[in-house]
Amino acid sequence: IQTRYANLDTIEEDYGINLLPLATFAMDKYAGDPCEQFKPKGDEVLSDKDFNMIAKMHKAISIMQWKMEGQIIKRRPEFRMENRLLLDKIDFEKGTVLVDGVEYPMNDMNFPTIDPKDPYKLTEEEQEVMDKVKSSFVNSEKLQQHVEFLYAKGSVYHIENGNLLYHGVVPMTAKGSFAVERFEGRRYSGRALMDYCDARARRGYYAPEGSAERQNGQDFLWYLWCGRLSPLFGRSAMTTFERLYVEDASTHTEVKDPYYTWYNEEAVCRSILAEFGLPGTSHIVNGHVPVQEKKGESPIKGGGRLVVIDGGFCRAYHEKTGIAGYTLVYSSRTMSLRTHQPFESAEKAVRENLDILSQKNILETENHRILVEDTDEGEVLRERVHDLKQLVTAYQLGWIPEARCEDHVW
């Protein structure tokens, strides 16, 4: 993804990860390949040399990615993602690939590292590159701090002050019921599916190093990124391979989960809230999909029960959406949505004294001011006060003996 948008500074400079092994490998293996389909996108100003090098890096790491994804799919048949095994569907003589049983011509047939007899096996050189890159990731202190923070503070969903927050979807069927997925011999749907996904993802970080459980969790983290019923993905497939190699646009389609149709219905939003033990007056705060406001799309769904928040971090979407994202503000009186207008950069805004314009839209006004005691934090404070009172009572009744200085060894 970072090579696609020429955003390698984040990896190399911010996280201190060495990409030289990948660059050296790519420049060697794809020396005479223009890598047309892999040229970086975006408005980053690059020299021709850097532009071509990043394109080659993009192709090299993509091939390795598809090989390793294929290994996961074969290792985890429960994911039911065999339709994403495409490297073994390439006909190297005819220059075609089978996608969902249909043969399509390919626009690029330069695969110097793929063995048609064993297409998902990394070459020795590829394995060496992956080992070095992995070592850099594992030994990046800042990256590990950020990953630790995500596991400590993050979750697949979160309930805060009566609001249900999640990134992607609660997988649904075309009839509007919660979709059922089977993992490790059990069926899950709705909240139970979200809880399962959260727990299994944690195995990939907290299970003992080198254990089967840790590998199991790490494989599942990949499923969460692009799996057919992943609550974090919400689409039928990630068709990156087809977009790069097949000109026929029909293969590029990524069918959205029925959730994206049903979340417009207030009754469905209320059923989702009920699934998570919340009243119908609560709100769902949803992310993941940019809202195309310039085409008239509204971020407010389901009769006001659901709000779609796109933070606008991906500049590439600004032209498509017509905005630079939203900020949801929840105060003691109101819940409001701030719509930000596109701007080039914060640095330019400060340098040229430009206004960063935002439009305020009040979604809901409370009849009475919400106090700290009315919030989840207030409940935590109440419990602490109760515990302290219990402690004082226990001390006053002599259940906790007074400690004297001579009892301690200093």
Language-model segments: residues:
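Feature recognizes metal-dependent phosphohydrolase scaffolds
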Residues: I1-W410
